[in-house]
């Protein structure tokens, strides 16, 4: 199952109460949508946005298990492995050894860091 951006937002809010984390998720989702269109993946813009929204799903409640706990949560919810790989890969070399492979995953890796500075 691939959640819609609305379902992704609701799921994010289940695990994140802080305004900063919610705002960060929204910004990363919007930036991911922008780059999907710019890089020729307009037909996947919703998916890219959903990945951006969910990328830090576990961070507020499980900072010491960031990315690994998220994979558990998403698998329990029946989320598609492609989405799980994408969100987990943004923690490459920090918390996990899942390497970003697809262009979308590489964009997420960079976008997460850059939007965190804003």
What are these regions (language model features)?
Residues 1-62:
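Acidic/His-rich, divalent-metal-binding segments that scaffold phosphate/diphosphate chemistry
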Residues 41-118:
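Divalent metal-dependent catalytic cores for phosphoryl transfer on phosphate-bearing substrates
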């Amino acid at each position: 199952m691939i959640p819609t951006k609305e379902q992704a937002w609701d799921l994010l809010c289940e695990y994140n109460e802080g305004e900063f984390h919610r705002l960060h998720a929204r910004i990363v989702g919007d930036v991911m949508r922008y780059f999907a269109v710019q890089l020729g993946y307009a037909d996947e813009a919703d998916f890219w946005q959903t990945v951006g929204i969910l990328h830090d799903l576990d961070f507020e409640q499980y900072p010491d298990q960031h990315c690994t706990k998220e994979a558990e949560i998403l698998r329990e919810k029946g989320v598609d492995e492609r989405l799980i790989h994408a969100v987990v890969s943004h923690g490459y070399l920090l918390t996990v050894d899942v390497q970003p492979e697809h262009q979308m995953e590489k964009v997420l890796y960079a976008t997460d860091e850059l939007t965190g500075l804003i």
